[in-house]
C-alpha cells in the first residue's frame, strides 16, 4: 500500500506524474481527432500535377461548399410555410448527395454545412436555375407543395441547389438577393 507521506507529497507537488499524464492524454486526443476528421499532416499529402484535372479541381478550387435554397417570391408564402418548404428541399438535397457523393457531403459538413436562402421572382426563374445547375453537374431538388394549406397543389415552391462547391453554385445563383 502507498504510504501516507507519498500521497501527501504527490498532492502538494504533483510534478512529473501529472505532466506525463497530461502529455499522454493530449497525444491520444490529438491522434483520435485526426483519425476522426481525416486530417493528415502536410508532409503526407501528395502534390497534384496541375496538368491533370481531378474531380476536386473540376468541382471547385476554393475548397468551400454550400447549399442554396431558392424560394419563389411570387407565391407570398407565410414564414412557416417557407421554413417547411426549405426544410423539405434541404433534406431532399442531403439524401441525394449522401447517395451520390459521400465525400462531397463530408467536405460540406466539415465546412459547417452552410445554407443560404435567396429569392426568385417566379416559377420560370426557378426552372431556369434548375436547368443551369444541372448543366454544371450540381445536385438539385425541386419541391412541389401538396396544396393542403396556403397554395395550389403541385406549385413549385423551393429549389435546393447543392451541397456543392461554392464557386459553381455562385455561377447559378450569385445574382439573386437574400430572402
From Swiss-Prot:
Belongs to the PTH2 family. Peptidyl-tRNA hydrolase which releases tRNAs from the ribosome during protein synthesis. Promotes caspase-independent apoptosis by regulating the function of two transcriptional regulators, AES and TLE1. GO terms for biological process: negative regulation of anoikis; positive regulation of anoikis. One of its GO terms (molecular function) is peptidyl-tRNA hydrolase activity. Monomer. It is found in: Mitochondrion outer membrane. Its main location: mitochondrion. It catalyses: an N-acyl-L-alpha-aminoacyl-tRNA + H2O = an N-acyl-L-amino acid + a tRNA + H(+). The keyword Mitochondrion applies. It is a single-pass membrane protein. GO terms for cellular component: cytosol; mitochondrial outer membrane. There is a cross-link at residues 76, 81, 95, 106, 115, 171, 177 (Glycyl lysine isopeptide (Lys-Gly) (interchain with G-Cter in ubiquitin)). This is Peptidyl-tRNA hydrolase 2, mitochondrial. Keywords: Hydrolase, Isopeptide bond, Membrane, Mitochondrion, Mitochondrion outer membrane, Transmembrane, Transmembrane helix, Ubl conjugation. It comes from the Eukaryota.
Amino acid at each position: 500500500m502507498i504510504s501516507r507521506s507519498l500521497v501527501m507529497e504527490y498532492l502538494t507537488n504533483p510534478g512529473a506524474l501529472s505532466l506525463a499524464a497530461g502529455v499522454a492524454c493530449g497525444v491520444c486526443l490529438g491522434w483520435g481527432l485526426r483519425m476522426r476528421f481525416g486530417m493528415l499532416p502536410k508532409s503526407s499529402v501528395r502534390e497534384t500535377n496541375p496538368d491533370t484535372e481531378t474531380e476536386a479541381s473540376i468541382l471547385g478550387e476554393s475548397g468551400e461548399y454550400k447549399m442554396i435554397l431558392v424560394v419563389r417570391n411570387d407565391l407570398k408564402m407565410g414564414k412557416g410555410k417557407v421554413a417547411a418548404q426549405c426544410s423539405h428541399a434541404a433534406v431532399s438535397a442531403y439524401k441525394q448527395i449522401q447517395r451520390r457523393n459521400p465525400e462531397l457531403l463530408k467536405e460540406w459538413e466539415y465546412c459547417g454545412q452552410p445554407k443560404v436562402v435567396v429569392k426568385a421572382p417566379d416559377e420560370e426563374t426557378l426552372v431556369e436555375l434548375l436547368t443551369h445547375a444541372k448543366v454544371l453537374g450540381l445536385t438539385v431538388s425541386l419541391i412541389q407543395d401538396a396544396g393542403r394549406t396556403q397554395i395550389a397543389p403541385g406549385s413549385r415552391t423551393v429549389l435546393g441547389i447543392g451541397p456543392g462547391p461554392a464557386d459553381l453554385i455562385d455561377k447559378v445563383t450569385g445574382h439573386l438577393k437574400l430572402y
